[in-house]
Amino acid sequence: MFSPQLNHVLQLVFDCNHIVSNSYQEIILKCRISSTKPGILFITDGTESETEDVLFDVQFLEKTTTIKIKILPISRTVPVRIHLFSIPIYLPSHALEIDDINALCQKENIDPTVYEQYGLTNMPISTTNVINQFKVVQNDSVEMSLILFNLNWTESPYQSQKLDRYGRKLLIVFSVFSIDTRECPYWENLFKSIIPLCRVNMISEPGISIYKIEFNDPFLTVFLRNVVLPENKRRFPITKECYLRLTFSPPDRSTVTLNMNMPYFKICADGKNLEVFFPNDMSLVSNTNKEITLRGEFTNKKIVGIFIPVQTHVFKLYPFLWFAQEPLKLRISCERTVSVTEHDMLGRVFFVTKKLFRKPFRSLSNSDMKSLLTHTENTDKPFDVHFMGNCFPAYLLPELTLHPLEYEDKPARGNPQTLPSVEKHSIIKIRI
């Protein structure tokens, strides 16, 4: 009779050649697993070989979940080892969260693509005159009332043609201004060494919205966007003045905050990770490595981000570690020339403690994502986990439970490539 056991790392070992006659068949192993703490479950290849025997995968594990492990169709001369372990995560949060009620109200009539990325990243700080008024409101928040004069608007050279619902051409123009937070007497006490959350309470002009906000202590840079109907090529029928009211509040200490709100960073629907998209429409040339740098960083040095690329045959992108106070740099290659858009996802970022991942790591192939277990001299902490260029004690990980499959979870008979239950195939479970 199968009985669940608690383990910090589950190691499944079996000889595939004893399960199917053709060792070149792909095998899918199903099992039910749970963790003592919510986190991300890593499915890693622990086989000591240069090839990738087990498909690397990452899944969020909160309750008892049925997972699928894919064993790749290669020649297997040694027993295949699978290492399963979970790591608790920190939830991502946009540090400068744009909650612009005006922009949402005007989206249909004025700016049908209010959240699109237009590729404008390096604009000079304008000579806009700013009159600041600060006051502390409830929940240790700072309300900022800003009166802007002499706004200088610039057209983005990267924008594609946009039309309103009447078929008229829309022009997107930008303006930038900065605020010295040292002028606010409460800022240092409330937001020392942290990045605040921002809420846009009011914008006086209906056509103006906040495109993005960037905080590099002590300066807060605000990028405004205006959607207009150009009268001619030389003159914009837009205002030179604007009144804003913003509220800044401390973030949740259990979340990871970014210093910039950008359209290519999007928190997923369940709030567990940060989705990363292409910054704009572009072409990827065959047999060429392309590096993309996405502006925006987090500042908590006790946390590290694990970038997991999407599984696609269009381009090649491998996992790596993203450290605090660094931009996200991606290296992409493809076998044939393809076109991608800003709606195509590159991957996801999960945030975990830096106690486990202290050294930088960037994989060059899928085989780099293998894991290894080694014995230590300390009998109380007998095993170390080697993964993504780092080594950490197994006891730091949450305990996992391997459960028997329920009857309704078992696949129909007659499929030789799917293993119906972990307890039926002589899997050796090593307690770590």
UniProtKB/Swiss-Prot annotation:
Q: Which Pfam families match?
A: Herpes_U55
Protein name as catalogued: Uncharacterized protein U55
**What is the organism of origin for this protein?**
Human herpesvirus 6A (strain Uganda-1102) (HHV-6 variant A)
